[in-house]
Amino acid sequence: MGLSANAEESGTCGPDLRWHLTDNGVLTISGKGEMYDYSYSKRAPWGKYDIKRNIIGDSITTIGGRAFYNCSALTSVTIPNSVTTIGEYAFHDCIYNHRTTKTNQKYPSVNL
């Protein structure tokens, strides 16, 4: 279980991507292009927080490997049509496994 964000947090997660986490657990990824891949030893910068909802911006093309690994509080993910690649284990060990938006024709659902 991660920490709850007591204040808003933000940073970078790709060459042209930024992330922003609200204190109520909504993570928004914005910008254009590819997200970095992460690993067991180099977790995503939001990995220590309880992410409840994830909104991925319309110009993002790749969800990085292990980007949301072990996000056990995650209940909703929005994947836009611009996403053409989802990295290995991107949503591995997430409790949530049933609510992915249908805005993306390639990934109308994700095997989590």
What are these regions (language model features)?
Residues S4-E9:
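Boundary at the C-terminal end of the N-terminal hydrophobic targeting segment
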Residues T12-G14, H20, E34-Y49, I55-I56, ...:
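A composition-driven surface/loop motif
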Residues V26-K32, Y49-T62, S72-T85, C94-L112:
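Structural signature of tandem-repeat unit edges
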